[in-house]
């Protein structure tokens, strides 16, 4: 909760300062405060709703089935291993689910450290050794212990808010400039069509730029989760698991799920837009101890 409060206060403070600067420069309209509130509600609202519904949406997306009672030795091993790692990491036992997919993958999600979910693919269970699978599970438990889902949501909320706010402000200025004396027209946004088109274009452009910020954090947290897995399961097991991921099918999970999974899509225009670092970089970081605490 402290992390959420600090992020919200920081975001609010920056927005207020930005509003004051607009006021002092005289380019602010009477609707800026309302726009600030609207941007915050939409920017954070969508991100937090997604977080609160994350377990349900993730299970629905992959068709996962939560293990209520283990039906075989593999399911028993999964529960026992995650229970042990959760205790080591100081978090409550997460729910554990299995979903059908040929690729070697797993993910963790949930709104709180003590109300989370770890899901693994059948491809992982069929193609990884127990040591490798143990390391992958430790990676997911580390994500939960680090609070990565909440932090990712807060960062997404902040960038969403600023994308909406700044694009609308600039669109308002552009529309007012192109329509001449907007006050005579009684329309603080100037030409409505210009305002709409410019705001949509700017939201698209700023959204692409903002995605590089969230993807940078996503890559950063993968390195730390790998390091956490090395502490829980051993660095050699984690390196072996990452080596095994090189042999996997291209991930089949939906694009919206990729940032949650241990094995992200390797094909991208640029590493800037990748949710995961290249596997070789992750292995190198483990061997060098770069992210070890």
From Swiss-Prot:
Source organism, top-level taxon: Bacteria
Gene3D superfamilies: Metalloproteases ('zincins'), catalytic domain
Name used for this protein in its record: Protease HtpX
Membrane topology: Multi-pass membrane protein
Binding site for Zn(2+): 139, 143, 222
Biological process per Gene Ontology, one example term: proteolysis
Record carries keyword Zinc: yes
Cofactor: how and how many bound: Binds 1 zinc ion per subunit.
Enzyme Commission number(s): 3.4.24.-
Gene name of this polypeptide: htpX
Pfam hit, one: Peptidase_M48
Similarity section: Belongs to the peptidase M48B family.
Listed CDD domains: M48B_HtpX_like
Cofactor(s) listed: Zn(2+)
Membrane-spanning intervals of the chain: 4-24, 32-52, 158-178, 193-213
Residues annotated as catalytic: 140
Entry keyword annotation includes Transmembrane: yes
Cysteine disulfide partners in this protein: none
Enzyme class: hydrolase
Keyword field: Cell inner membrane, Cell membrane, Hydrolase, Membrane, Metal-binding, Metalloprotease, Protease, Transmembrane, Transmembrane helix, Zinc
Single GO molecular function: metalloendopeptidase activity
Cellular compartments per GO CC: plasma membrane
Lineage summary: Bacteria, Pseudomonadati, Pseudomonadota, Gammaproteobacteria, Enterobacterales
Intracellular or extracellular location(s): Cell inner membrane
Primary location recorded for the protein, binned into one broad class: membrane
């Amino acid at each position: 909760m402290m992390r959420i409060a600090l992020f919200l206060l920081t975001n609010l403070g920056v927005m207020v300062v930005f509003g004051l600067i607009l006021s002092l420069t005289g380019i602010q309209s009477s609707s800026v405060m309302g726009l600030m509130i609207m941007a915050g509600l939409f920017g954070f609202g969508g991100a937090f709703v997604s977080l609160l519904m994350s377990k349900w949406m993730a299970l629905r997306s992959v068709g996962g089935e939560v293990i209520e009672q283990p039906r075989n030795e593999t399911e028993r091993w999964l529960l026992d291993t995650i229970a042990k790692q959760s205790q080591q990491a100081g978090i409550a036992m997460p729910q554990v689910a299995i979903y059908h997919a040929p690729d070697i993958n797993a993910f963790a999600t949930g709104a709180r450290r003590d109300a989370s979910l770890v899901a693994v693919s059948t491809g992982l269970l069929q193609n990884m050794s127990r040591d490798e699978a143990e390391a992958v599970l430790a990676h997911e438990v580390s994500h939960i212990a680090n609070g990565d889902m909440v932090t990712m949501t807060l960062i997404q909320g902040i960038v969403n808010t600023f994308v909406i706010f700044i694009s609308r402000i600039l669109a308002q200025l552009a529309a007012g400039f192109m329509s001449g004396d907007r006050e005579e027209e009684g329309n603080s946004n100037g030409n409505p069509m210009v305002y709409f088109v410019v705001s949509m274009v700017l939201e698209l452009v700023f959204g692409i730029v903002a995605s590089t910020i969230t993807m940078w954090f996503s890559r950063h947290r993968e390195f730390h989760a790998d390091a956490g897995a090395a502490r829980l399961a051993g660095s050699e097991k984690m390196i072996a698991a990452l080596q095994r991921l090189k042999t996997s099918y291209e991930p089949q999970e939906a694009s919206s799920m990729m940032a949650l999974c241990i094995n992200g899509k390797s094909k991208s225009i640029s590493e800037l837009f990748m949710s995961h670092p290249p596997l070789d970089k992750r292995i190198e970081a483990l061997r060098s101890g770069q992210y070890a605490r």
